Amino acid sequence: MNIDQLRRSLKDRWLDYYEANRSWISRLSIWVSCEGKRRPSSSFILGVLSTEEPRLTEMLPLIVDLSNHPDRIVVALGLNFDPEQELNHKQLKAETPKYLPASSATEAPQKPRRPAEVDEACEGRNRTTPSPQ
C-alpha cells in the first residue's frame, strides 16, 4: 500500500467514525484550530485511528520516530480538516445528480466518399476479371 492509499483509507475511516459518533464527539472539549482548520485534537484523532486502522498501528512507531509532534503527524497523514465540513461536502457530492454526456446530435453524418451506384445486373462496376491460372 502506498502513502496515498493509506491517507485515503485513514480519511474514510476517520469520517466514518466521526459520523457514527458525532453526537458526543462534538460536545467534548477536544476541539482545536490548526492551520486555520477546526478539528478534534491530534491525539484524539490518532487514538481513534490506531484502533480503526491496523496498518497505522504498524506504522506509528516509525512515524513517531520521525516526528513526535501529533499536529505534524495529523497534517502529514492528510487529516487536518474539519470533519463537519468534509461530511457536508461529501453529502452534497452524493446528492448532485449525475448526467450522461450529451449526444452529438449536432454532428452531421459523414457522406460516403464515393456515391453509391445502382448495379441491378449485379456485375460489379470496374471489376477486373480474374486471370486464368
Curated annotation (Swiss-Prot):
InterPro entries: Uncharacterised_15.3kDa. Residues 114-126 have a biased composition (Basic and acidic residues). Residues 88-133 are annotated as: Disordered. Pfam families: DUF5331 (PF17265). This is Uncharacterized 15.3 kDa protein in frxC 3'region. It comes from Leptolyngbya boryana (Plectonema boryanum).
